[in-house]
Amino acid sequence: MEKTVYSALGESVWHGRLPNGLHIYVDEKPEYGKQFAFFAACYGGMDLRFRTEDGHWRDTPAGVAHFLEHKLFDTEDGNALQILAANGAEVNAFTASSLTGYYFEGTDGFAENLSTLLSFVSVPYFTKESVDKEQGIIAQEIRMGEDNPDLAIYYMLLEALYQTHPIRVKVIGSEQSIAQITADTLYECHGAFYHPGNMVLCVAGNVDAKAVERIARNVLPGEEGAMAERDRPAE
């Protein structure tokens, strides 16, 4: 990893790219009491159509990226949110049009928590039962969003600005679109976009950059993975 010093800001950041393609950024702050880690995939609500290395185009229902964000917390060992919380970390996630991010902060157990974060995001575990249950949960979230005037105005603006570009589609999807999502859909989209070459890890706080790199090397796959080709109409 190489260190870049930003003299005007009084800051320095370590950056490196692992052989598997993962970009890592670390801001060492030894005087801080907390550690913060952010792990993100360049995959979001507008990535509805893509082509994988077999050459075939896939059309996926609106809301898959957000649905995937919810379900990745489920692991064979239990719920990752509960595992991290039990180890003293505050954890959350979000899905935007072009990005899905998972993050935590805490004061203790950083190495273990970082390993957990990298593991549950990169190793999917879906069942038909859990997907069916999540459809009801997200449907309720969709209905709640319909009562949010700010959100309604935002998407009305996008629909007026774009006629075909998928950024006009709601990240969360609709009740009709999420009903089409299956465990196979989630596995396919995870395989297409959740590989190290399409992801970034950012860490800040009382941490050691070399230790962060070592954990990432140990937990994540060693290969970069094939990049899916996205279909984003020019508009």
State each model region's role.
Residues 1-80, 187-235:
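His/Glu-rich zincin catalytic helix
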